[in-house]
Amino acid sequence: MLASAGGYWPMSAQGVNKMRRRVLVAATSVVGAVGAGYALVPFVASMNPSARARAAGAPVEADISKLEPGALLRVKWRGKPVWVVHRSPEMLAALSSNDPKLVDPTSEVPQQPDYCKNPTRSIKPEYLVAIGICTHLGCSPTYRPEFGPDDLGSDWKGGFHCPCHGSRFDLAARVFKNVPAPTNLVIPKHVYLNDTTILIGEDRGSA
């Protein structure tokens, strides 16, 4: 029934249905708006990096106090293996003999910070810091520090060999010619906090 000037008159079934429909639409719109507001909160929160994600990308420290000449230390940074190699005097002396056999002996391709664009690709000549991922298809090469092994040839002066497809890198992480890998291994940003601690993933410019 609806009020009129003369009292009340009956509402048709069609009118009742239309009114119900309007009420339902309005109620649904209100609930939908409120629900969207609540749904937005976890979505926005999910776009913020979690503590674990931030930690995964954070710099890591490498303690080299017990790293003997010729030895390699593996550190995990951003989910990637990072190598720290303590090169012996013999290893350093052999580096220049590799130059004619390398794709990029002077590190012209920017695979390293500017402060590592030198013959040893390092801050301190005796310590190499490199990401242990082959630049071909992302395998992790094997550390082969020995000189002249049977499987790598008499002219091998130590380095890294990728068993997946045969790429080779010397002890400055520089790629040899005629192998699948196109570029030298990546040298990450790093800085020496003291004589025995390297901070990997950060340097003086970003500290």
Swiss-Prot record:
Q: What class of enzyme is it?
A: translocase
Alphabetical keyword list: 2Fe-2S, Cell membrane, Disulfide bond, Electron transport, Iron, Iron-sulfur, Membrane, Metal-binding, Translocase, Transmembrane, Transmembrane helix, Transport
Boundaries of every Rieske domain copy: 100-199
Quote the PROSITE patterns the UniProt record gives. RIESKE
Q: Which GO terms describe its cellular component?
A: plasma membrane
Topology with respect to the bilayer: Single-pass membrane protein
Q: What Enzyme Commission number(s) apply to this enzyme? A: 7.1.1.8
Where would you find this protein in the cell?
Cell membrane
Q: List the disulfide bonds.
A: C139-C164
Spell out the Pfam families in the cross-references: Rieske (PF00355), UCR_Fe-S_N (PF10399)
Which metal ions or organic cofactors does this protein require, according to UniProt? Answer: [2Fe-2S] cluster
Q: Any additional notes? A: The Rieske protein is a high potential 2Fe-2S protein.
Q: What does this protein do?
A: Component of the ubiquinol-cytochrome c reductase complex (complex III or cytochrome b-c1 complex), which is a respiratory chain that generates an electrochemical potential coupled to ATP synthesis.
Name this polypeptide is given: Ubiquinol-cytochrome c reductase iron-sulfur subunit
Organism of origin:
Allochromatium vinosum (strain ATCC 17899 / DSM 180 / NBRC 103801 / NCIMB 10441 / D) (Chromatium vinosum)
